[in-house]
Amino acid sequence: MKTKKEAVIFDWAGTTVDYGCFAPVQAFSEVFKEAGIVPTMEEVREPMGMLKWDHIHTMLNMPRIKEEWKKKYGKEPGKEEADQLYARFEPALLKILNQYSDPKPYVLETVEKLREMGIKIGSTTGYTDLMMEIVAPAAKELGYAPDCWFSPDSTGGMGRPYPYMVFKNMEALKISSTGKVMKVGDTVSDILEGKNAGMFTIGILEGSSVMGLSLEEYESLSQEEQEKQREQAKK
């Protein structure tokens, strides 16, 4: 017997706002370039969805980046280097976040339909509270306002793939079982968050960080090319 869903928990950037998830990509690329390391788009996007410090630490441990860092600085990067890059990353991201808070196409209509069905809207994010204090009000002005949001700050820094932000949502929304909740996101860590919480999980393809195209780039493609991009994103 299927359990009726009572809530949907969405991710933010790349899922409900910021088509293509470009705000963090821009900031990550900028701070690594400032440090003399030019990351590829694949390297920048692979850890997307994690807590941002964890994202930087993961990038520093990628074989090519680690080797480039060792050549430039004479030692392998560690926690100290991640701290230094994050100290530059946060202000770089905060400076541009309000430009990347527009709801993606069909998000407002989807949320409206879900609420008509009596379904509550929760959300989790890899952003910090400070970042969300910019994104959430900007998105609300444009019509998107979930019933609640939780960042890794609410769980002692235990962000994705840990499921604890999801459980915070369930508590706030007064949902008694993970079987009554659906998790939606656009990154591998989003999917793992939902799976680790033991709930039905959906991956977004169009406008996702994994696909990495702007709305204009995607809409300029033929239907065949769009389908090819969607299939590639599934891999």
Question: How would you label these PLM feature ranges?
Answer:
Residues M1-E6, L108-K113, T128-K235:
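Asp-based, Mg2+/Mn2+-dependent phosphohydrolase catalytic module
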Residues T3-L108, E112-M117, E133:
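N-terminal helical cap/lid subdomain that shapes the substrate entry/recognition surface
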Residues P47, S123-G126, G185:
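Conserved residues at beta->alpha junctions
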